[in-house]
Amino acid sequence: MSYNNKSIKELHELLVNKEISALELTKATLSDIQAREPQIDAFLKVTEEKALKEAAAIDARGINPDVVTDGISIGVKDNIVTEGIETTAASKILGGWIPPYNATVANKLSQSGLITIGKLNMDEFAMGGSGENSSIKPTKNAWDQTKVPGGSSSGSAASVASGEVRLSLGSDTGGSIRQPAAFNGIVGLKPTYGRVSRFGLIAFASSLDQIGPLTPTVEENAQLLNVISGFDKNDSTSSNVAVPDFTSKIGQDIKGMKIALPKEYFGEGIDEKVKEQILAAAKHLEKLGAIVEEVSLPHSKYGVAVYYIIASSEASSNLQRFDGIRYGYRAQDIKNLEDLYVKSRSEGFGPEVQRRIMLGTFSLSAGSYDKHFKKAGQVRTLIINDFAKVFEKYDLILGPTTPTPAWDLGARVDDPISMYLADLLTIPVNLAGLPGISIPAGFADGLPVGMQLIGKRYDEETIYQVAAAFEATTDFHKKQPIIFGK
């Protein structure tokens, strides 16, 4: 029997009332994964033996009635280190690496009774927006297996949307949670920068990376954010701010709430059908009592250029540690130390990672630092200021999550610029360190369309309030791909 259509609150009631055991639920989840994985390819590793052992231990001690996540399974993106479980960031260079420690979020999952059932596929080192840059295999879209699932948290989104797992963790550097959530018709949140510890997250771009939850519904998303949030002394960028109950405003009405609609998010390059769905969603929020007005974010058009300079520069520095000596892939038939470095990195890194390392190294070079990296930092400040100005008058910003629905597998592999432009609407949120969510808001040609809601720093509660109000009065989140029911 499959339980993949039940919320974690419903599953918790079954567990507390002993209508099902954690072991039975885990076995059912493993069956769901086994049935769908050949078509989806969301997992790099399923930790069956470990998961069953943890579930049996939870049954032995008894379900905690006060912890809604106790005994529930979760998938974890493969750039989040897990003690004793191979962690590769979907890269050949980290093949076979078994971490001796847990990421802070991995510990928090265990402390909340969540069972890590496996490691999820992704674009290599989180560099990509389609899931096709995995060095192991490409994940498929849950709605149409000929389409991309989005990236870089490809497995995190597809596993939830296809009914393999109810919950997953991803990471978001320029849209890597929100974009695949949109493409797969689920809920994905990038928290405020610093809200969730990055300790144990394999770094891509340290000033932009953030771990976040992917789930079928808004409430479950908030429940998972409750688990992973909080200050961590091991992460110098972790914020020592109070962690509220993120579910506290869910169910409250949104009358009088002011929502901004940036005209730049509906301009050139935005698919007409996507635009139509998002404007209809804005009208729906107006019917619920919100005040929706057009605004301008004039510097958002520079976001993609700024992002690829800053992110690639930080990546070129972060990825220096993968040298073929301390751990991971080591080239054979080498002549000297330099040859070892060059061959190990050339053979171990995929083409997109190499492209970004070269771009970043160029941007940081003596002749380009002021012209590119420093200038990008200045424009980043202008983007931050644009958001701050809008948030003086408005509670939230609304727009499409992506310019288009999911495209065909292979369609943009040889066109990195068009791939980069797919993150046009999500990137500014990372540059400004703001929280942003994607929720299902319609369909275009049978494929899901995501609506993005952007909030003030540390105000994920208001995002969840509006997202839940929309979800409660629409049916988009109830629609499921064919594979879900298999």
UniProtKB/Swiss-Prot annotation:
Classification via NCBIfam families: gatA (TIGR00132)
A GO BP term here is:
translation
Q: State the family named in the UniProt similarity comment for this chain.
A: Belongs to the amidase family. GatA subfamily.
Q: Select a single GO molecular function from the record's annotations and give it.
A: ATP binding
Record protein name field: Glutamyl-tRNA(Gln) amidotransferase subunit A
Active-site residue numbers = 77, 152, 176
Write the Enzyme Commission number(s) for this entry.
6.3.5.7
Role according to the record:
Allows the formation of correctly charged Gln-tRNA(Gln) through the transamidation of misacylated Glu-tRNA(Gln) in organisms which lack glutaminyl-tRNA synthetase. The reaction takes place in the presence of glutamine and ATP through an activated gamma-phospho-Glu-tRNA(Gln).
* Pfam family, any one: Amidase
Ranges where the record places region Disordered: 131-159
> How does it associate, per the subunit comment?
Heterotrimer of A, B and C subunits.
- Compositionally biased spans, kind Polar residues: 132-144
Keywords of this entry: ATP-binding, Ligase, Nucleotide-binding, Protein biosynthesis
SUPFAM superfamilies given in the database record: Amidase signature (AS) enzymes
> Where along the chain is composition biased (Low complexity)?
150-159
Q: Which organism is it from?
A: Lactococcus lactis subsp. cremoris (strain MG1363)
Which reactions is this enzyme annotated as catalysing? Answer: L-glutamyl-tRNA(Gln) + L-glutamine + ATP + H2O = L-glutaminyl-tRNA(Gln) + L-glutamate + ADP + phosphate + H(+)
Q: Does the keyword Electron transport apply?
A: no
Gene Ontology cellular-component terms listed: glutamyl-tRNA(Gln) amidotransferase complex
